[in-house]
Regions:
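A short, structured surface patch at a secondary-structure boundary
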Residues: 1-54
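Short aromatic-enriched loop/helix-cap "lid" or pocket-rim segments at secondary-structure transitions
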Residues: 21-24, 85, 135-137
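Extracytoplasmic substrate-binding proteins
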Residues: 58-133
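C-terminal lobe and pocket-closing loops
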Residues: 4, 132-136
Length: 137
């Protein structure tokens, strides 16, 4: 939503309306939602679909067979991976300069954070969350 031109987005994931999953709940409310099913998404006539690599394979494959351009965005396993996602999404939306600017800003803010003197162990628990482990953010 931050990188798209006005009118460029047709729909957003239902997860974007969940305050436990999205930092842009209010903005997402301005768009029709989808649940990621190929039939529902196809009927919205998109020319591009941004999908996570964990999106149902059948949906991604069917959309591609129907001629829809699908760009898969891998999950961020580390904070450093977020900048790569920004660049990928910016390029996919036809705004690589926006993706690059956002990624550089993110990297600068990340670099400005203090580095702890030693590793810190932490555990996270929250409703509807995911289990954290090796190789996760």
């Amino acid at each position: 939503m931050l990188m798209a031109d006005p009118g460029q987005l047709v729909s957003v994931s239902h997860m974007s309306l969940d305050p436990l999953s999205s930092a842009m709940v209010e903005e997402a409310g301005a768009y029709p939602i989808n649940r990621g099913g190929a039939e529902q998404v196809y009927l919205m006539h998109p020319d591009l679909v941004l999908a996570g690599t964990y999106t149902a394979r059948a949906s991604v494959d069917l959309l591609r067979r129907l001629g829809v351009d699908v760009v898969e965005v891998p999950p961020a396993d580390r904070l450093q991976d977020v900048a790569a996602q920004m660049r990928l999404i910016g390029a996919a939306l036809g705004h690589p300069e926006r993706g690059e600017a956002m990624a550089r800003d993110f990297e600068a803010q990340l670099a400005a954070l203090p580095t702890p003197d030693q590793a810190i162990d932490a555990a996270m628990y929250y409703p509807n969350g995911y289990t954290a482990g090796a190789g996760t953010l």
